[in-house]
Design a protein with these regions (language model features):
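Membrane-interface "cap" regions at the ends of multi-pass membrane proteins
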Residues: 51-105, 293, 332, 336
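Extracellular/periplasmic helix-exit of transmembrane alpha-helices
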Residues: 307-325, 377-419
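Transmembrane helix-loop junctions in multi-pass membrane proteins
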Residues: 37, 104-105, 117, 176-200, ...
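Membrane-interface helix-loop-helix modules in multi-pass membrane proteins
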Residues: 84-145, 156-160, 177-193, 370-397, ...
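Flexible loop linkers connecting adjacent transmembrane helices
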Residues: 58-84, 110, 120, 124, ...
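A generic transmembrane alpha-helix motif of multi-pass inner-membrane proteins
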Residues: 36-52, 245-282, 286-292, 302-309, ...
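Extracellular loop-to-transmembrane helix junctions
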Residues: 37-54, 58, 111-142, 151, ...
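Loop-to-transmembrane helix boundary motifs in multi-pass membrane proteins
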Residues: 160-175, 374-380, 435, 464-506, ...
Length: 648
């Protein structure tokens, strides 16, 4: 499947009225209107985001007391499965590749219905003061609590009931994402049949090549991870090895495309997810994320070079409208824009990655700001690039002055993004076929890396729900009661994937329209939990209060509008719309109830807890951690195991 077909599937999930119209339907570029140069906007955005990272990000790290001398959970609690210390770039690559899914491209371009200026402003302001703070905060709070997940933090600071409700929400959230992204990724690789039902090689070549590369990715990643551990490949050696392997995989994939239908690829993706979700993280997920990040960095570089080259040719003018009004065909700017943009500015899903997997890999506490805050800033830059590419292509997609789409031109977010970057790559000499295959692979990678992260998070959420312990290291080692079976990584992964597989064949479409609101509700619950964490540990948390208030108001407004819309639809359509509007109504009401319960409990804790009443947890150690940490490091660390200090 080409990037255009992939985007068509993606837009089918959006569930908003704008998803059933051309992206820029109703938007016109008026004669005499001044236009922004894409190169200028790109440079300004890069400077603003870099300043945010160097200024606000580092200030926040100092404010919260990041300690580069402290031994992290990844080192102290290394267990050969979930806790695995990694270099700063490796940990960054895991975080970045896991969070940078479809959102920063799809959400930003869809939101351009309100004009490119409000979207850019929200991406920059939201990325620096909301999203990056959210991601870094979740990562840091987890690290200061022995790698606890967000649900376990809620248990500690708010209560066991809040934890159970949150875990149920997370697991159901993961099922929806697994279903949607499995459908999208499989559709990306699926072959296109001709009239007789045979493979149409001309139309299926790029998808087949990308499929081959993706299959090779899994096996090469495991070999790469083994080689890095065996031969101690770090820094430049590790990066160069990764680049060489990527080039080799790409060359092989171009020569040996694999042609399977949609169901065949769904089976392949599901088998991969079983291993990605259950295997020790350093064996598959960690090295695959490293290689994926190399590819995504190359994509970003290609996008930047393409915009610069087009700018040199006078073809980088953003012709899309700067502002179209506070109300468009897709609804009111508040809350639609802020719910739609999601990953480009803030996404609640990121907190599950930060606290669920990344906190167990960061080797040095000082790297937390690079991994948590830095990855989000880079993702915001990807969102800005998507806006620029779409803005430049606006005049090509629309018949001048009419807002009607020209025939045969990309008209969906990923198609716009992929086509625009491919054009830019051709502008500086890359072969068109190579550019198409490269972008097809990137389009699928954006979804696949988030998909395997969700599979792993869904598995851990399932196990944590039944666990009696609130200890991150003890959950999978708990062998009492149902945890003898449900605590097993392979069992929990399969149990999580089976309902996701069932939903893949259409059921998820009925509730997908609420994904944006549920994602931001998760972000709001994360931020308010972080506010409680800061107060309980005596840290300054005032910078979280405004984001918390904004997110909760925005989310509940969006859900309230959805509930009203569902009620109206049910009154008009009756039983005929029960499977869609009825299910959405039930899900929306449950989300509101869950959000209110968690928010009210958090507010009670904020008002009732004394500052500094619950200091950071005493460091925990695993047997592997004891062996691997040097006697000097352990003796110098606060809470070093008894006997180790004496040995030093």
């Amino acid at each position: 499947m080409s990037p255009v077909r992939f985007a068509g599937r993606l837009m089918g999930l959006m569930g908003r009225r704008i998803a059933r119209r051309p992206i820029f339907c109703g938007l016109t570029s008026h004669e005499g209107e001044k236009h922004m140069n894409g190169v200028v906007l790109m440079v300004v955005a890069a400077v603003v985001l870099a300043a945010g990272y160097l200024g606000y990000g580092r200030w926040l790290a100092n404010k919260w007391g990041v300690d580069r001398e402290a031994l992290t959970p990844a080192c102290r609690m290394e267990d050969g499965h979930n806790f695995s210390p990694a270099s700063a770039f490796t940990a960054f690559s895991h975080q970045f590749s896991s969070i940078c899914g479809a959102g920063p491209v799809t959400g930003t371009i869809v939101a351009m219905a309100f004009g490119w200026l409000p979207v850019v402003l929200w991406v920059l302001v939201g990325g620096i003061f909301f999203g990056a703070v959210h991601d870094f905060g979740a990562l840091y709070a987890s690290m200061k609590n022995n790698g606890k997940s967000l649900a376990q933090l809620i248990d500690k600071y708010i209560g066991r009931t809040g934890r159970r409700l949150f875990l149920l929400f997370c697991w159901l959230f993961c099922l929806i994402v697994i279903a949607a992204f499995t459908s999208m990724v499989s559709g990306t690789f699926a072959m296109t049949p001709d009239a007789s039902g045979a493979v149409d090689v001309a139309k299926s070549y790029a998808a087949g090549c990308a499929g081959t590369i993706s299959i090779l990715f899994t096996f090469v990643a495991m070999v790469f991870g083994w080689a890095c551990r065996k031969f101690n490949l770090t820094g430049a050696k590790q990066f160069v090895t990764g680049v060489v392997l990527m080039v080799a995989m790409f060359a092989v994939g171009m020569q040996f495309p694999v042609y399977l239908d949609l169901n065949g690829w769904i089976a392949v993706v599901m088998v991969y997810l079983v291993f990605a979700g259950a295997m020790p993280i350093q064996m598959l997920k960690q090295p695959r994320d490293y290689l994926t990040s190399i590819m995504m960095i190359v994509m970003i570089v290609c996008a930047v070079l393409g915009i610069v080259v087009l700018g040199a040719k006078g073809q980088a003018t953003i012709t899309a409208p700067m502002f179209t009004g506070f109300t468009t065909a897709s609804g009111m700017m508040f809350p639609v824009l802020f719910v739609s943009v999601a990953c480009g500015a803030l996404s609640g899903f990121h907190s599950l990655v930060s606290s669920g997997t990344s906190s167990k890999q960061v080797e040095n506490e000082a790297d937390a700001v690079k991994v948590g805050y830095g990855a989000m800033v880079v993702e915001s830059f990807v969102g800005v690039l998507a806006i620029i590419v779409a803005g430049i292509m606006f005049s090509d997609m629309n018949t001048a002055g009419t807002g009607a789409l020209n025939a045969g031109v990309a008209s969906t977010p990923f198609a716009i993004f992929a086509t625009g970057i491919a054009r830019g790559m051709q502008a500086f000499g890359v072969d068109g076929t190579v550019a198409t295959v490269f972008m097809t692979m990137n389009v699928s990678a954006l979804a696949l890396t988030s998909l395997d992260a969700v599979a792993r998070i869904g598995r851990t959420s399932f196990s944590e729900f039944f666990a009696t312990s609130n200890d991150a290291l003890a959950v999978e080692n708990e062998k009492t009661g149902v945890m003898k079976v449900l605590g097993n990584p392979w069992v929990a992964t399969v149990v999580t994937l089976l309902p996701g597989l069932a939903l893949t064949f259409g059921g998820y479409l009925n509730i997908w329209p609420l994904f944006g609101a549920s994602n931001q509700l998760l972000g709001g619950m994360t931020m308010i939990t972080l506010a409680v964490f800061c107060k309980c540990t005596g840290r300054s948390g005032w910078m979280l209060y405004a984001p918390v208030a904004f997110l909760l108001v925005c989310t509940f407004t969006s859900l309230g509008m959805s509930i009203a819309g569902c009620v109206t639809a049910l009154q008009a359509g009756g039983m005929a719309v029960m499977a869609t509007s009825g299910l959405q109504l039930v899900f929306a009401v449950l989300l509101v109830a869950l959000g209110l319960i968690v928010a009210v409990n958090c507010l009670k804790e904020l008002r009732g807890k004394e500052s500094g009443s619950m200091p950071d947890e005493e460091p925990e150690w695993s047997e592997v951690g004891r062996r691997n940490c040097s006697a000097h490091q352990a003796a110098a660390a606060d809470g070093a195991p008894e006997g180790l200090a004496a040995e030093a």
